[in-house]
Amino acid sequence: MKLKALLLSLICCSAVYGQTVKYYLSMPKPQNHYFQVEMVLEGFEEKTIDVSLPVWAPGSYLVREFAKNINLVKATNGSGKALKVQKKKKNTWSITKGKSSEVRISYDVYAFELSVRTSFLDLTHGFVSGSGVFMFVENHLDTKGDVVVVPYAGFSKVSTALPRKEKNKPFVFTYSDYDHLVDCPIEIGNQLVFDFNASGVKHTVAIYGEGNFEIESLKRDMSRVIEEETKVFAQNPNKEYLFIIHNVVDGQGGLEHKNSTTLSVNRWTYSGSSYVKFLSLVAHEYFHLWNVKRIRPFELGPFDYNQENYTDLLWVMEGFTSYYDELLLLRAGYYTQSEFLSKMESSINYVEGSVGARVQPVAHASYDAWIKAYRPNENSSNTTMTYYTRGSIIASFLDVKIIRNTNGEKCLDHFLQHIYDKFYVKAGRGFTSQEFKSELESFTGENLDNFYADYIDGTAIPSYAELFDGMGVQVTDVTSTKPDFGASLRSSGGKAIVSRIRSNSAAEDAGLSVNDEIIGCNGYRVSKSDIEGLMKSLNEGEELELLIARDEILFSVSFTMTNYTRPRYLLNLTNEKNKLRAYWLR
């Protein structure tokens, strides 16, 4: 029986080992914005195979329904005989293959949304975000294979972090499993490509679009940022890394991958303060190659591509990264200590001055990213708080706490090194929220129940002076109470339109709603600037009669000015020499 079981096991392993999925990606007519995809499946024993297209892109927490871009799915066997294809659910197709050892599945993907998380194709270039283009075989995400890119005749280059299968075949790539495949975006066209070395890693930059960049400046400055990032973790796991940069009108940020990133920036961003912001984006996305792609909760890899993957730790994944994308620019010499504190001051005042900060805990903001952060509405500022900025402030608290507790011997860098080594290097896995908290408590030497209750699972306003005590930073509370309209306006065709209303404000009490047009005040026609100037001149208790148009119906509302208390803090360096500050803001 044991021999029989062993033989059976070997046969099964052989069958699984022989399974491959090969993709052919072509674009014969870029002006119609369609990629043509052919999947060649070999070695699958099932008589019926289900193939699916993901509903989301890892790193961007929103169900995007990529299957909406696919019109028709066809399948044949190795002899070219048509196979039955039945749509099973919104993003899944079932193929009856019978005993066929080879199955060819073909479909076209509409690609005309140029962002870091979606795909695009026109006569200037093509960009593939894998999760929106490549289907996978259900229950076989671990299957390996090849990708053959067939560029349009006018395109000469393909840039991707996927390894080339053979040196003499520049457009044939290989992948180890589906996660690997879709974690490597592909730029196709005539992009500018250059290389540089930093931290012992070859870095390639592929730039689409004109801009005011200078190649040598990018090499120098990106290298400085990368060197500082690598020092945080004391090692860089990559041998090669790719930056895909899209120079466009409306830059949209970046998206992280394990050994590459895509950055979307305004084409004129490469000078002055805008260039420093660009370097901050570089720092942010590059930091993710450790924090998110390797240091991660269980929910962030391997992925379930058919539905949301919930975690309450985005305040760590994105918040810690946001803290370091500024701190590392300080270490690299792009900020002074005062400039860094000014950045932190702005973050603190943004968070504490937001109504939503008193409503949504940062752990909840993480979990609800799928339905709130990526789907904002006119009321979002009253009910939500970004885990990016709030998380960066929490990271600063923890950094200072570790520095103070160790008298300047250790900092948050060392904690990140610890969990990177424990969970990624040695265990090769993610962690739970409780495991993260336990490791943090062990490293800081403190019970963090109250800290979590106040700042992670709660919405308390921190005592900033106490938290930064002993760090050579003076925190001044300049919270003020002033008359406040409680509404924001936008101008549309010369009309003053209400765009946002703060909850429990004078505007809300008066009955104003978003999208109302304010036409007049006390019998006089007013513009947006008139209203804003008038509101600034009012004292608490003063009244106005506003003429409103809502859904083309005119009516009046009585407005009474009320006060609003907005928390605000100033952060300044003290004049004293401070060992802990010197270590923190080095």
Task: Enumerate the predicted regions with their spans.
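Early extracytoplasmic/domain-onset interaction patches
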Residues: 19-56
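Non-catalytic architectural context of zinc metalloproteases
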Residues: 63-72, 76, 80-238, 250-251
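Hydrophobic residues positioned within well-ordered beta-strands of beta-sheet architectures
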Residues: 21-23, 35-39, 103-105, 145-147, ...
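Juxtacatalytic substrate-recognition/specificity segment
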Residues: 192-314, 320, 324
